[in-house]
């Protein structure tokens, strides 16, 4: 036997290296074997529910880091609420309809030398369904690999018949409330995908366009002006001029009549200088009027034989141009509003492909709108009304799918009216704004953001001219044109869809008469022949009804309505948050959520957006293969996710280093608890050593701060709090001090059991606090905890969070140890200086002599018998005058002095402490070690080194 064999050295099978890429799939397998999600539901049955409703990702392609960030954040929150003892089910979902899937299917058809037109709608929809299902299955496995716990066996899919049926019922409710209508209004239109687009589906990018100033000749010169008078407009969309049906001026602005040679130009007073700079036109101001005095003046179109009028509009601003705005109600939202006010139709001589129809002048018929710009500019030049022409770069809406510029185009569409009166006698807009005030928005600026959007948004265009989606289930009477929007008919169609294996396909396979209730007649003219609506619903309506199709459906008995939380990227203020809010308010008079939490976007290490063109995209799979999913989860909480969050290989390496430190701390716990039975060996609080009570007090503070951070969704605070606690408070101080006591004292001594009791508390609490974040590693640790305490649950995720034990909080003790820590910090500096001066090589070779102010001296003096272990030296002496080989002034302890000299006595071969009892009367070890060996019934004669 050797001296080291008499020590309680750490023992554990918990590996130093995580080997997460290989270990994590084994843990997922364990969760599946024990059916963890079902077990959670059983354990939490009857408890208060917490519902985080999953915003559905799009079933197209593999997941990217944005998906990972989103799902991990949701998982952290759901796991925390579950570990607080709540019933927190999570039903993941997928958005399965829409144009991107249609486009992918068309690409596949092209490879087979087929076209969409060669298939029936049902055949095409079948291919779309198969494509969506393929990616649902791919993404499901990718999300599970991230450690997300949820109802993966029964997710919600927007293409599932029961979901589609509820969507049709929701549409029926909106029609019953009288706020759905069909109208011809300008909407975003993609001329390449040939469909209307939602505001949330456009993205703004730089585009080059002509910038022109055009003179429109007034039919008669007003105010007794002799010369010809021209109203001057400025536009960057010359292609909209064929649809010009008016000019708008602001009633409150001042407008000037500027005489230049034999012509007079009308321009806003505040824009005269910039107008003259651009056009080179200068002259004499002969008249100044308010905008309202120009109302109803008539002018001639510059290249069409048409007379139109000047109208008043509050939308006209003085930022650029002339203060007179060309009005095309068929191509602009504000133009349309003013047109409606004055009874001017929405005219748009442009077809689905963006080509001018025969309603446009002959010289541009058949041309696409952007191609026509040049021809129109040339025509204006020929007619002598082009005052200035240049090319400008400006921000312009583009289709988020095909990346091409979109146009505003008036087409017959279905809308939900924002200003129609609901059952409560209020507008949908007004009700939605009230709900926004009731909902909790995190971060708080989200409230103003969505409020501003709702205040200013146009009516919601819910129709799309595509195949893969849920039909707008209305009919038209062939005899009188009456729209059949009877709620009973909606209910009948919903029932048919729900019972059919392929759901809404039935709409495209059957004739109108087969779909309507038997013997149905037009309530207006008694007609028997009907036509189906061909348009489908906007995908934002699809996902916007998820609260009803999922939470209210009863298909998932673990759920409830409304949701406690919606959590998505900040772009969803104009997307899913908004569509869900409007649908919820329209159908049920309230928002379907009580709180909304948003996260930012992912940037590379340099702060650039992730893009394939920059080559800075990192697939989650790459990170998982290299480091494991827990490192990705730790990255999610490493920064404030409510802002944009950076990622890169250097950052991940740094996070992996932090992970290793945390893991090694748990290894220390487990290694020193190998002979500890949590049910038998715990030391009662009142018998614990003082330093152990101090650490328990500090642990309670950490538990309290962690709960506060989780409850306020400040997950990065938890990471930094625990990281600091583990690295600074534990590894650098407490665990370092504890080694001597754990190794040297007899296994069942009070000194050792006291330390082990607190180690177990630390292990138990920290594992639970980290479980929502490091879901795999904490599960691995919990397997070893079960060996120490077989009464714990089978999975860490079935456990509940630690709660603060007020009895363990000791502010006075914390204050005492704050002082001792300051003394310790100064001692460590002095020891470092002594090491540099070759006085000592190891702290145990040192004796420290302390000269301290009274308040510090008294706390050390009370603990003089054992304080050397706290300072990790062999001897401590208090003196009025610190004398030694190295003397330093106190940095932390003002007025203090620390002297370091060689410790007296010999080095104990067992504990390495220098003590005068070593060698005395032939004793090979110090008195303390002799006592422990006797307790352990180990004879000196049995130790080889002692012979």
From Swiss-Prot:
<dbReference type="GO" id="GO:0000049">
    <property type="term" value="F:tRNA binding"/>
</dbReference>
<dbReference type="InterPro" id="IPR002300">
    <property type="entry name" value="aa-tRNA-synth_Ia"/>
</dbReference>
<dbReference type="GO" id="GO:0002161">
    <property type="term" value="F:aminoacyl-tRNA deacylase activity"/>
</dbReference>
<dbReference type="InterPro" id="IPR002301">
    <property type="entry name" value="Ile-tRNA-ligase"/>
</dbReference>
<keyword id="KW-0963">Cytoplasm</keyword>
<feature type="binding site">
    <location>
        <position position="929"/>
    </location>
    <ligand>
        <name>Zn(2+)</name>
    </ligand>
</feature>
<dbReference type="InterPro" id="IPR033708">
    <property type="entry name" value="Anticodon_Ile_BEm"/>
</dbReference>
<dbReference type="InterPro" id="IPR013155">
    <property type="entry name" value="M/V/L/I-tRNA-synth_anticd-bd"/>
</dbReference>
<feature type="binding site">
    <location>
        <position position="926"/>
    </location>
    <ligand>
        <name>Zn(2+)</name>
    </ligand>
</feature>
<feature type="binding site">
    <location>
        <position position="908"/>
    </location>
    <ligand>
        <name>Zn(2+)</name>
    </ligand>
</feature>
<dbReference type="InterPro" id="IPR050081">
    <property type="entry name" value="Ile-tRNA_ligase"/>
</dbReference>
<dbReference type="Pfam" id="PF00133">
    <property type="entry name" value="tRNA-synt_1"/>
</dbReference>
<dbReference type="InterPro" id="IPR009008">
    <property type="entry name" value="Val/Leu/Ile-tRNA-synth_edit"/>
</dbReference>
<keyword id="KW-0648">Protein biosynthesis</keyword>
<feature type="short sequence motif" description="'HIGH' region">
    <location>
        <begin position="57"/>
        <end position="67"/>
    </location>
</feature>
<dbReference type="Pfam" id="PF06827">
    <property type="entry name" value="zf-FPG_IleRS"/>
</dbReference>
<dbReference type="InterPro" id="IPR009080">
    <property type="entry name" value="tRNAsynth_Ia_anticodon-bd"/>
</dbReference>
<feature type="short sequence motif" description="'KMSKS' region">
    <location>
        <begin position="609"/>
        <end position="613"/>
    </location>
</feature>
<comment type="similarity">
    <text>Belongs to the class-I aminoacyl-tRNA synthetase family. IleS type 1 subfamily.</text>
</comment>
<dbReference type="InterPro" id="IPR014729">
    <property type="entry name" value="Rossmann-like_a/b/a_fold"/>
</dbReference>
<feature type="binding site">
    <location>
        <position position="612"/>
    </location>
    <ligand>
        <name>ATP</name>
    </ligand>
</feature>
<keyword id="KW-0436">Ligase</keyword>
<keyword id="KW-0862">Zinc</keyword>
<keyword id="KW-0067">ATP-binding</keyword>
<comment type="subunit">
    <text>Monomer.</text>
</comment>
<keyword id="KW-0547">Nucleotide-binding</keyword>
<dbReference type="InterPro" id="IPR001412">
    <property type="entry name" value="aa-tRNA-synth_I_CS"/>
</dbReference>
<dbReference type="GO" id="GO:0005524">
    <property type="term" value="F:ATP binding"/>
</dbReference>
<feature type="binding site">
    <location>
        <position position="911"/>
    </location>
    <ligand>
        <name>Zn(2+)</name>
    </ligand>
</feature>
<dbReference type="GO" id="GO:0004822">
    <property type="term" value="F:isoleucine-tRNA ligase activity"/>
</dbReference>
<dbReference type="InterPro" id="IPR023585">
    <property type="entry name" value="Ile-tRNA-ligase_type1"/>
</dbReference>
<protein>
    <recommendedName>
        <fullName>Isoleucine--tRNA ligase</fullName>
        <ecNumber>6.1.1.5</ecNumber>
    </recommendedName>
</protein>
<dbReference type="GO" id="GO:0005829">
    <property type="term" value="C:cytosol"/>
</dbReference>
<dbReference type="InterPro" id="IPR010663">
    <property type="entry name" value="Znf_FPG/IleRS"/>
</dbReference>
<feature type="binding site">
    <location>
        <position position="568"/>
    </location>
    <ligand>
        <name>L-isoleucyl-5'-AMP</name>
    </ligand>
</feature>
<dbReference type="Pfam" id="PF08264">
    <property type="entry name" value="Anticodon_1"/>
</dbReference>
<dbReference type="GO" id="GO:0006428">
    <property type="term" value="P:isoleucyl-tRNA aminoacylation"/>
</dbReference>
<keyword id="KW-0479">Metal-binding</keyword>
<keyword id="KW-0030">Aminoacyl-tRNA synthetase</keyword>
<comment type="function">
    <text>Catalyzes the attachment of isoleucine to tRNA(Ile). As IleRS can inadvertently accommodate and process structurally similar amino acids such as valine, to avoid such errors it has two additional distinct tRNA(Ile)-dependent editing activities. One activity is designated as 'pretransfer' editing and involves the hydrolysis of activated Val-AMP. The other activity is designated 'posttransfer' editing and involves deacylation of mischarged Val-tRNA(Ile).</text>
</comment>
<dbReference type="GO" id="GO:0008270">
    <property type="term" value="F:zinc ion binding"/>
</dbReference>
């Amino acid at each position: 036997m050797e001296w080291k064999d008499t020590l309680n050295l750490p023992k554990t099978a918990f590996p130093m290296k995580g080997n997460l890429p290989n270990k994590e799939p084994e843990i997922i397998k364990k969760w599946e074997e024990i059916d963890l999600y079902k077990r959670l539901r059983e354990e939490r049955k009857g408890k208060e529910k917490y519902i985080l409703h999953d915003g559905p990702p799009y079933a197209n392609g593999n997941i990217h880091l944005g998906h990972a960030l989103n799902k991990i954040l949701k998982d952290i929150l759901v796991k925390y609420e579950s570990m607080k003892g709540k019933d927190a089910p999570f039903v993941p979902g997928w958005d399965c309809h829409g144009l991107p899937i249609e486009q992918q299917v068309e690409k596949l058809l092209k490879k087979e030398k087929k076209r969409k037109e060669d298939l029936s709608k049902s055949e095409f929809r079948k291919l779309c369904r198969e494509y969506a299902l393929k990616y649902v299955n791919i993404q499901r496995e990718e999300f599970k690999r991230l450690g997300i716990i949820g109802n993966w066996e029964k997710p919600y899919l927007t293409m599932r018949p029961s979901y589609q049926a509820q969507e049709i019922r929701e549409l029926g409710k909106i029609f019953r409330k009288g706020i759905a209508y069909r109208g011809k209004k300008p909407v975003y239109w993609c001329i390449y995908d040939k469909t209307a687009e939602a505001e949330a589906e456009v993205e703004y990018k730089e585009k080059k366009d002509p910038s022109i100033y055009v003179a429109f000749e007034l039919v008669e010169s007003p105010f007794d002006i002799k010369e010809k008078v021209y109203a001057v407009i400025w536009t960057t969309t010359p292609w909209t001029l064929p649809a010009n049906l008016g000019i708008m001026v602001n009633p409150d602005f001042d407008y000037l009549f500027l005489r230049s040679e034999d012509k007079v130009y009308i321009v806003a007073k505040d824009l005269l200088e910039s107008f003259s700079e651009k056009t080179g036109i200068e002259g004499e101001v002969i008249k100044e009027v308010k905008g309202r005095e120009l109302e109803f003046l008539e002018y001639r179109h510059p290249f069409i034989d048409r007379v139109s009028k000047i109208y008043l509009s509050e939308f006209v601003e003085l930022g650029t141009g002339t203060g007179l705005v060309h009005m095309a109600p068929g191509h602009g939202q504000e133009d349309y509003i003013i047109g409606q006010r004055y009874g001017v139709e929405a005219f748009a001589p442009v077809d689905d492909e963006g080509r001018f129809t025969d309603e446009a002048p002959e010289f541009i018929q058949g041309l696409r709108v952007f191609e026509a710009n040049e021809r129109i500019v040339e025509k204006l030049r020929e007619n002598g009304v082009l005052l200035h022409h240049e090319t400008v770069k400006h921000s312009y809406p583009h289709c988020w799918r095909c990346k091409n510029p979109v146009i505003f185009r008036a087409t017959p569409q279905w809308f939900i009216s924002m200003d129609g009166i609901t059952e409560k006698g209020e507008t949908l807009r007004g009700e939605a704004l009230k709900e926004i005030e009731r909902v909790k928005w995190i971060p708080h600026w989200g409230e103003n953001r969505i409020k501003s959007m709702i205040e200013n948004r146009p009516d919601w265009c819910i129709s799309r001219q595509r195949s893969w989606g849920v039909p707008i289930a209305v009919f038209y009477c062939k005899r009188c044109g009456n729209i059949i929007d009877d709620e009973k008919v909606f209910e009948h169609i919903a029932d048919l869809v729900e019972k059919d294996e392929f759901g809404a396909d039935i709409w495209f396979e059957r004739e109108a008469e087969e779909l309507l209730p038997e013997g149905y007649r037009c309530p207006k003219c008694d007609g028997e022949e009907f036509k189906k609506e061909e348009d489908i619903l906007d995908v934002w309506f699809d996902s916007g009804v998820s609260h009803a199709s999922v939470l209210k459906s009863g298909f998932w008995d673990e759920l409830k309505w409304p949701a406690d939380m919606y959590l998505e990227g900040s772009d969803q203020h104009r997307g899913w948050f908004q569509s869900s809010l409007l649908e919820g308010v329209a159908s049920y008079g309230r928002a379907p959520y009580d709180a909304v939490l948003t996260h930012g976007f992912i940037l590379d290490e340099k702060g650039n957006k992730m893009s394939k063109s920059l080559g800075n995209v990192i697939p989650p799979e790459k990170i998982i293969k290299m480091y494991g999913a827990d490192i990705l989860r730790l990255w999610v909480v490493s920064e404030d996710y409510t802002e944009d969050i950076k990622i890169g290989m250097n950052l991940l390496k740094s996070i992996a280093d932090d992970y290793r430190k945390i893991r090694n701390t748990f290894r220390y716990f487990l290694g020193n608890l190998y002979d500890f039975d949590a049910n038998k060996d715990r030391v009662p609080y009142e018998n614990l050593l003082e330093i152990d009570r101090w650490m328990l007090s500090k642990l309670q503070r950490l538990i309290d701060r962690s709960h506060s951070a989780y409850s306020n969704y400040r997950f990065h605070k938890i990471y930094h709090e625990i990281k600091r606690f583990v690295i600074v408070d534990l590894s650098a101080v407490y665990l370092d001090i504890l080694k001597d006591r754990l190794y040297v004292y007899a296994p069942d001594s009070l000194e050792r059991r006291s330390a082990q009791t607190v180690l177990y508390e630390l292990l138990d609490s920290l594992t639970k606090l980290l479980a929502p974040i490091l879901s795999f590693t904490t599960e691995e640790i919990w397997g070893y905890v079960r060996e120490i305490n077989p009464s714990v649950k089978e999975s860490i995720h079935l456990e509940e969070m630690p709660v603060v034990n007020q009895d363990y909080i000791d502010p006075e003790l914390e204050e005492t140890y704050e002082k001792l820590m300051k003394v310790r910090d100064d001692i460590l500096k002095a020891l470092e200086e002594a090491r540099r001066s070759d006085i000592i090589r190891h702290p145990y070779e040192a004796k420290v002599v302390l000269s301290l102010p009274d308040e510090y001296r008294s706390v050390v003096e009370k603990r003089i018998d054992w304080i050397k272990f706290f300072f990790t030296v062999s001897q401590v002496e208090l003196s009025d005058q610190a004398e030694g080989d190295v003397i330093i002034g106190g940095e932390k302890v003002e007025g203090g002095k620390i002297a370091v000299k060689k410790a007296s006595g010999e080095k104990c071969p067992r504990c390495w402490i220098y003590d005068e009892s070593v060698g005395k009367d032939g004793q090979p070890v110090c008195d303390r070690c002799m006592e422990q060996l006797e307790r352990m019934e180990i004879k000196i004669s049995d130790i080889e080194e002692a012979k």
